[in-house]
Amino acid sequence: MPRNVPEVNGVYRHGACELWCRAMAHALLKRSGVRRGLGGREGPLKRLRLAVEDFVRTTSESEACESRSAVARSRPGGRKSRKELRKEKRHLRKARRLQRTVGSGSGDQGGNVGLNDGPETRRPPTEVRPTPAKATATPAKASAPSTNTKASAAQPKAKAKGAPGKPGPATATARKRALLAANEEEDREIRKLERCLGLHKRKKKGDGSSVPLSFARDGLDYILGALECGSGGGLYESSEEEEEEKLETGQTVLESDLESNSKESEEDPDWQVLQEDQEDVNSKRRGEAESGTRGNKGTKKVRFAEVVEKSRSSSEDDIEQQESHSVESGEKYIPPRLRNEEVIDVHKKEELDRLKKHVKGLINRLSEPNMASISGQLEELYMAHSRKDMNDTLTTALMDACVTASAMPSRLMMEHVFLVSILHHTVGIEVGACFLEAVVKKFDAIYRDGGEGKELDNLFTMIAHLYNFHVVQSILIFDILKKLVGTFTEKDIELILLMLKNVGFALRKDDALSLKELITEAQTQASGAGNKFQDQNRVRFMLETMLALKNNDLRKIPGYNPEPVEKLKKLQRTLVRNAGSGSETRLRISWDGILNAEQTGRWWIVGSAWSGTPMIDNSHHIQLQKPLAGMASSKMLELARKQRMNTDVRRIIFCTLMTSEDFLDAFEKLLKLGLKDQQEREIVHILMDCCLQEKTYNPFYAFLASKFCDYERRFQMTFQFSIWDKFRDLENLPDTKFSNLVHLLAHLLRTKSLPLSVLKVVEFSELDKPRVHFLRRVLTALLMETEDDDLAVIFSRVSDNPKLGMLREGLKLFIGHFLLKHTQAHQSAEEASLLREKAGLASKSLQGKAILRM
């Protein structure tokens, strides 16, 4: 075939070849002297023309078939380079110029003959289906199946193309080497990207491929199973199946290429001829492909299912091998959820570090002058952060600052504990409770280990100051002292002296009976010790200190100076005046209750099980009640029956009250009964009834009632409700009960056991004669028997509450109109003058604390 015949997409155009042959025949005729109109020699010329046309037709058919198969083998991608396309365009333009030259130089007869025979040359030849080109090699990597897939998908396109000639073995070998080199280059690029991403592969046993460890952690190892060596065929088969489905619907790769190049071929008439021929060929091919596809579709699906099962089994083996590898190497699988928590923990840790630095800086600058500002900043931190984080951070900072191997200065120790008491009253009782638990547990741990440093002294001093600043009640202090007296070593004696020096007189004021029992037990231990101690002076000094506390002799306690504590207490009242933590903020918890908080629950948290622990073992309380009932004499039981004590609980309470030595003894015995909520209220009711039944007023009941009111708020509320019940029935009370009730209420108001707001139920606008008489006697006793400072505090407690406005106005009106109007008639001049002075002080206190200062 001549070289100047144009080629389009690897297929020689039939029309150009035909024109070239006609031009050559016309040139031969001109050389032989043949002219139009010569009829003598027309027969040989006609035979020559037919022979040339037959030769052109057979040659074009055979070469077109060979070119299709050659192109399919030569070009795996199915597309030419830009250089080849430009070369084809040049040949096409040259063929067009030759066609125009031949058409203009030939005669009418020759041109008519050529045009009449044109459709015959465009008749589609008999199709010869070439065999698709097979893959020359199967690379080991996963990119080889994708390359073969592209080659197989390009087969239908290659069938419609021609080639200038059949490529030789050297060309096929070079093409094969180029493909292998491209695959190796692609593998090198993949390995380079994996190194950049840190996806290091792990060696696997057997035929399984390697999967990066990060993919296995993310759960993507089974997804990548389709790309492994054993499952690569699945993708190849699926791509062929998709191609066959496209053949069924008539969408071949060649058609898509023709559609994409339709705009370029609209202006080319020769291209339209080739497109028509190709459509005829494709119509025949579709019919054959439909029958072949229906037969092979089932087998391909079966093969693909086998490949999928194989990939699944291989992925399961990979997972097992990964797990065994992680166990052997000591690695632990971390789920994504836990990895997110690790990231969150990092941010949380950074935030806690900043909080610790801030709190530590405030603690380092702590002193009495800037106590208000530092406590205010800590309150803001409590509002900005969680309570748990702040409690832990503050407790750790204070423990690091105060618990050292050397003795801390007493002033510095008081200031740190004083800060805790301020936050305990302003923020909430959980602040002091958390700090108290940490201190007690630290003290118990060091005490059990037998620490020789001053850590025990510092911790013991902190507990003592927590009691001084009203964070904890005396029950914890007595528990610790009883524990130390029970062991009674030299270190215990030293700690007992330290505690009595700091809080001894406060303990005597709060619970003198328990202090008396403690002193008696200490004397017993000292007498039984004998020559146990090398230094007997220390034991003697401890006993002398205890006796000085018992006798209220301050001179015999060396180094006792209550002024710093009293000064800080006054500052505390200033800072926590408007605190909203409640009226009773002192924690009543025992030593065992704190140490067993893990089992019984932390009582300062709402819903904790601590409140129920004193009544867990009810059998113990029943055993206590029976001996008490048996110890009561028949005379006492008869007296209880006359007082209408018709239940066992009432009889036990009555007998306990009547047989006690003093109010402290009665208080302890009543608490040891372990009564429940409803049974505890019977204590108040029986106490009130016994007090009113006395022929003359007995202060025993008033002091006992004051002790119960200071012990728990629930007793205070029960006394308040009981007194309100008596208010409603004042006109029916006998004179004895009336007088006893006046003295009882005046005592409770004077000792601040009950607030002045207990009178808020009195309607001052509708007072009758019994109520006027009752209020005059109560207020007179309160004003005459109370000191000025205490009187100002009692009346000022109702001045700040807006809900008690009617009570304030009623009291001022009653004092001015009923109390001071007839003072001269019933009292002496001195008493009347003192009463008017106290009444003026009470009226100013009711108006507000600012007026009282002026």
UniProtKB/Swiss-Prot annotation:
The record's subcellular locations are: Nucleus, Nucleolus
Low complexity: which segments have biased composition?
128-173
| Region span, Necessary for nucleolar localization and for targeting PPP1CA to the nucleolus | 2-275
Q: Which cysteines are joined by disulfide bonds?
A: none
Give the span(s) annotated as Disordered.
Answer: 66-215, 231-333
Q: Ranges for the MIF4G domain?
A: 356-553
Q: State the family named in the UniProt similarity comment for this chain.
A: Belongs to the CWC22 family.
Q: Any idea what this protein is called?
A: Nucleolar MIF4G domain-containing protein 1
Query: What organism is this sequence from?
Result: Mus musculus
- Chain's gene name: Nom1
